[in-house]
Amino acid sequence: PTVSSLVGQLYEPGDRRLDSAYTIFYMGVNVGSFLAPLVCGYFGETGNPQDFKWGFLIAAIVTVLTVVLFETQKNRYLIGPDGKPLGIIPDARKERPQADNTARKSAHANGRTMRNYLLLALLAIALAGFFYWCFGDDWISIGIFTACIVFPVSILLEGSLTKTERDRIFVIYIIAFFVIFFWAAYEQAGASLTLFASEQTDRVILGWEMPASWIQSFNPFFVVILAAIMPGVWGALGKRGMEPASPTKQAIGLLLLSLGYLVICLGVKDVQPGIKVSLIWLTGLYFIHTMGEICLSPIGLSMVNKLTPIRFASLMMGIWYLSTATANKFAGTLSGLYPEAGKVKTLLGYRIETMYDFFMVFVVMSATASLILFLLSKKLQKMMHGVE
C-alpha cells in the first residue's frame, strides 16, 4: 500500500478528522521539501554545474535511511483502530457491505475478466496510436496520457462495483481532471518561476544575494506553518456545520492559485526590460499558492481515501497521483511559453510577449477551472452519497 493510503487506514471510515490528518501528513512531507532546496542549492550553486551531483547523492542516502526507518518502526506506529498492523491485508470489515459478494463469484467472472483485459488492450493500442499521431515519438507523453485513461477505465469495468461505488469513483475522476489544471500552473515553481527568480527578481538582502534555488523553500516553509493552522480551522468550521465539502475546498484552492498569479501580474505590469522586481512579489505569490495547495492537495488525498472501496485503495491513490504526472507534463509545455526577447509566442491565439502576458495565462486558466468546479460542487456532493 502507498503511504498516502496508510494514513487513511489509521482512522475509522467516516471519521471527520481525516482531512486534518492528511493536512498534518502533508506538513511532514513538506519538512523535507523545505530542506532539500537549501541543501542542494548550497552544494550545487557554486558556478560549476557538475556540483549538483552531490544533491543526487544526498537524496539517495536520505531515501535509504527513510526506508530503514519505515521498516523498523512500522509495526510500532502503523496500528489501525482495531489494534492490528496496517498495510498487510485489507480489513474487509472496514468496507461497507454494499457489494454483492455472490456476484463476484459468478460463473461468468473469468469470462468477464478476459473480456475486460481484451478491451483494455485494444483501448491502450488505440490511445497509443492517437497520442503518437499527436506527439510523435515522445514516448513519455504517450505513456502518461495512455495510462491516465486506461487505468481509470480498468476500475470502472470491475463487475463488483455498486452504483454508489461507481458514483464515488466518478467524483474522484472528475476532481482529478481539475487538479491537472492546478498542478500545471502550480508546478511552474520548478520551471518558469525559478527562471523568473534567477533573471528578473532582485534577491539581494542586506548586501547578500540569495541563491535562486533557495526560493524553492518558500512554499514548503509556508506549508508547514499553514498546515499547523488549517486542521483547527476545518475542525472549528465542522463543529458549526460550516465546513465546505471536499469539491468546494478544491475549487477554493484553484481560486487562490489564480489570485497568486494575479499578484505577480501586478508586480511585473509595465516593468521595463532589464529592471528586476522586488522579492516581495514572488513571496506573496508563493504564500497565496500555499494556501491554495493546503485547500486542495491534502483534502484531495483525504477525499480519495474516503470515496474509494478499500480493495482499490492503493490503485486509486496511484491514479490520483497519475493526474499529477499529467499536470507536470502539461506544466512543462506551458513553461515553454516563457517570454524571450525578440520572440512572440502564442497560445490559442493569445500573444505572449511580456511576463504579464505569460502570468495572465495561469490567472485565466485557474480561475476558469475554479468557477466550473464551484458550479459542479453540489452535483458532486450528491454523487458522494453522504461522504463529506
Where are the language model's segments positioned?
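Hydrophobic core of transmembrane alpha-helices in multi-pass small-molecule transporters
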Residues: 175-180, 273-295
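Intracellular juxtamembrane helix-capping segments at the cytosolic ends
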Residues: 1-12, 294-309
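Intracellular loop-helix junctions on the cytosolic face of multi-pass helical membrane proteins
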Residues: 13-14, 41-194, 199-204, 234-240, ...
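Glycine-rich segments within core transmembrane alpha-helices of 12-TM secondary carriers
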Residues: 17-38, 44, 58-66, 121, ...
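Transmembrane alpha-helices of Major Facilitator/SLC transporters
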Residues: 144-156, 208-240, 253-261
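C-terminal ends and interior cores of transmembrane alpha-helices
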Residues: 252-274
